Amino acid sequence: MSPAAAAAGAGERRRPIASVRDGRGRGCGGPAGAALLGLSLVGLLLYLVPAAAALAWLAVGTTAAWWGLSREPRGSRPLSSFVQKARHRRTLFASPPAKSTANGNLLEPRTLLEGPDPAELLLMGSYLGKPGPPQPAPAPEGQDLRNRPGRRPPARPAPRSTPPSQPTHRVHHFYPSLPTPLLRPSGRPSPRDRGTLPDRFVITPRRRYPIHQTQYSCPGVLPTVCWNGYHKKAVLSPRNSRMVCSPVTVRIAPPDRRFSRSAIPEQIISSTLSSPSSNAPDPCAKETVLSALKEKKKKRTVEEEDQIFLDGQENKRRRHDSSGSGHSAFEPLVASGVPASFVPKPGSLKRGLNSQSSDDHLNKRSRSSSMSSLTGAYTSGIPSSSRNAITSSYSSTRGISQLWKRNGPSSSPFSSPASSRSQTPERPAKKIREEELCHHSSSSTPLAADKESQGEKAADTTPRKKQNSNSQSTPGSSGQRKRKVQLLPSRRGEQLTLPPPPQLGYSITAEDLDLEKKASLQWFNQALEDKSDAASNSVTETPPTTQPSFTFTLPAAATASPPTSLLAPSTNPLLESLKKMQTPPSLPPCPESAGAATTEALSPPKTPSLLPPLGLSQSGPPGLLPSPSFDSKPPTTLLGLIPAPSMVPATDTKAPPTLQAETATKPQATSAPSPAPKQSFLFGTQNTSPSSPAAPAASSASPMFKPIFTAPPKSEKEGLTPPGPSVSATAPSSSSLPTTTSTTAPTFQPVFSSMGPPASVPLPAPFFKQTTTPATAPTTTAPLFTGLASATSAVAPITSASPSTDSASKPAFGFGINSVSSSSVSTTTSTATAASQPFLFGAPQASAASFTPAMGSIFQFGKPPALPTTTTVTTFSQSLPTAVPTATSSSAADFSGFGSTLATSAPATSSQPTLTFSNTSTPTFNIPFGSSAKSPLPSYPGANPQPAFGAAEGQPPGAAKPALTPSFGSSFTFGNSAAPAPATAPTPAPASTIKIVPAHVPTPIQPTFGGATHSAFGLKATASAFGAPASSQPAFGGSTAVFSFGAATSSGFGATTQTASSGSSSSVFGSTTPSPFTFGGSAAPAGSGSFGINVATPGSSATTGAFSFGAGQSGSTATSTPFTGGLGQNALGTTGQSTPFAFNVGSTTESKPVFGGTATPTFGQNTPAPGVGTSGSSLSFGASSAPAQGFVGVGPFGSAAPSFSIGAGSKTPGARQRLQARRQHTRKK
């Protein structure tokens, strides 16, 4: 509404309100005011709502309520009655002109004014802040009468009506006058009174609003509002008559705000008393109003000037104190306390703070002086930040105590030492911290380190003692300190205030946080270790020597290297921090922490203590295992900690539980030590468990971790499963038993749900429920939630002969960690199936099929772990070839940040080295983000592992297209379930694109869940994390691999999984089956996707390239689509899947177009793919489409498992039911 229209409408509405008010005001002083306010509010609402005055209305309502409550009490009723009478008389005299000016509006105000004279006077006085001018309230009355009827009804000013016209102008002008000269009031009155009366009425709510401001202004809450209000009022008053009402409020606000906070009560009293007497007539007069406004302005200006002057002086003092810009830079951090700490340079902040309070200025000055003096020695800006960081690193207590001390009487000495300490000790502190981390991993926190550091190491103690001595007594360490001391004492009082701000202000660096976390983790680890040390000590002592932390590199020859190769330290700071975290658990490997610190998680020997807990040697005396197992989780660290289990290469032969020393030597002895240390990473923690060689007879995987909620069931034979330490993830150690099943231990136990332990070894029980997998069943277990599925190789049981490798390391964790597991296969033929481990968050892990045990290295955020021995690890995206010639290549998994993929080694039959896949495949790509490579692991020849789910559901085992799910589909944390069961690849080498698959394994093994691995969530064997049904399909859509996010197999995000042989699964994001790509990296040997995602399909089909984002994967033949790579045909001739869609990627049945056909909808839809080929396309984001039949396994691949993406629920109902049923079954198991 235009102001005029609004004013007019409001005026009409308010007039009746005014009349009502008049009647009520006259009738009853207090109640009438409240009633009038209510009526005025209603009128205002009606008027304002269309005018977009919702805010004004709220303000009006609040102001009206305030007035109603405050007015009656303010003006005593005797006073109010008296004043009302006086005002009413005055208004009668003054009102005629005012009324005439008002054009009849004044009459209504008169009635209102009559009732609330005293209240008005009080209000005017209180708001104006002057005893005389406040009384001019009658003047406002004239103006206010129109406006006030709505606004001041509570005041019940009968007198208002009398003076209203002139007062109205005056009052209105008052408001503007606060910001502007009296001229406005004088000029505005006549037009406004006459012409804008309706506007004024409309403005009435605003008048209340200004009053509301004044109310807050008194507390000091709304001073800004008052300022704005004044300016706005000045502007608004001309604009709208509302300002007429607001002027009154403005009057009140200025005094309350600056002037009247202390004086308001006095002013109110004076105004109430004086206004009725001599000032009553004056208030009506313009002159009185103007004079009052002028006085207010003068007072305000004076106050402002004073404040500005004080602020300026304070700023000058601060500047002088700081004696330089550097000092000023310091000041904000130290001096300004909380706000200043955020700002590097104090200038503006100081001023702002100064303006806020003189006390703050003084405090700031003192702080700045002390800080500035300190800064003089050091660089001005940087030292302060470093100091802050240092204080945080030393621990809040040290910095804080120093700051407090500074404030204290001896603050100057303390401050100088504190600042000097912060700066000088900072470097030593860092070194010391490092030493402490290595030597004293136990130091709980930066604080603890600070406290301990004095008494702790000589190096630490000397610098810190010096610092402390300085802080305690002002050491004359430097002239600067003396200066600081001198300056500080003068400002000691101020400094008292300052100390807290420095605490707030000191910057905390990521390092500080990391140190604290590490310290806390160390405490946890120490507590766990203390228990486990007794058991673990025997084991731990030897291994430390052997493999230092395993970095990414994995030992080339799995055998000899496992102990040695891993040593490479990782440069990652994150890894180092994790390692540091880990080392504390195995304090003995302090050296490890230093060197291994780099990649502690992986180094098996390092944390022998961890290993034994892990139950390294499964065969070893179970007695040891239990304790270690319990401890096993000592290594587990909660979030940040990473215990590194030492990798013990298990020799084929039994590994003694201690094994590490032995294994270090032995692992080479047998072809497949394959103990890959498994790491499980729970949320942030990684821990590796060394896989201990299993005793030949029984593979027992010791559960790495005990589920948090429930103890894992003990392994059948070992009974090993000690309740793991709390850590959720369990890394199963794989035993590389010769013979019989390899045990894969489920690598990681899902926090929420358990994965079944691999078959023979009941690895760790899932947290919630322990399930043990039947012994024979390929070990893959799928972790539920964690999606760590270790895919143990599906293989394990099949050929007893092959030592089935048991996949080696299991789950890495993931955030970024990949663990590579390689179980080395037993020596020759058997491929080791690597169990794939899912990463929680997406670290993929690779398992090396090859005999060499691969260590899964933990991957930190983007690093891929090294894979199986042969394979090299690729870092980000590079794919690593698996070196292993025959037996199995190991696949390396790389990790993607989100989804990692893990490669499995396919190593097919021993004979067939073929596995080019293994070489390539694994590596294929590691996608930095979520690469997943999985090679399907053929089970041993003769065994077809059949994905439980749809994988190869339709296929007859041995069928050309056995879907050979990658032996592990890596699971993704999110949803990856990890490995798909190994599919049989019917053809050994022949797979057209990739030889990945060992040739036909005759008997299929069923994966526990569906695919070899469970999906974390409910995915089928391959089960994608979320629920992709098909073993092969990834959660999102990749058929094979599960991806929680959608990477099919491994990749976290888009990784697709590789498909078993023909059916390709598509990854959600588009990676093609073979390897999902999280973000795009996928390595599929066969086709490559532009993004790097390719998946190779096992056996025949090549995978098509995956997509990086939306790449879908295509059918078997390896064709890669570039980005979105559509689909490849499958070599087998099985229908190829349709290409996935880049973003959406669904793969559809082979022929169908991505979009057309069932292609998955991108976002959450899922389309079922009809038809054969697996369709399971997944859509990249959330949509997953399950092919309708695919679930059934119609497609050659067997099913497209619909994958579930994050939110997408698209699964075929049948698939979901199956998944649910299977989940239940697995849990029952």
From Swiss-Prot:
Basic residues: compositionally biased ranges: 1219-1229
Keyword Secreted: no
Domain of life assignment: Eukaryota
Membrane topology: Single-pass membrane protein
Positions of the UniProt region annotated as Required for targeting to the nucleus and nuclear pore complex: 1-398
Chain positions covered by the region annotation Pore side: 62-1229
Transmembrane segments: 41-61
Family note: Belongs to the POM121 family.
Domain notes: Contains F-X-F-G repeats.
The protein's role, per its UniProt record: Essential component of the nuclear pore complex (NPC). The repeat-containing domain may be involved in anchoring components of the pore complex to the pore membrane. When overexpressed in cells induces the formation of cytoplasmic annulate lamellae (AL).
UniProt name for this protein: Nuclear envelope pore membrane protein POM 121C
Gene: POM121C
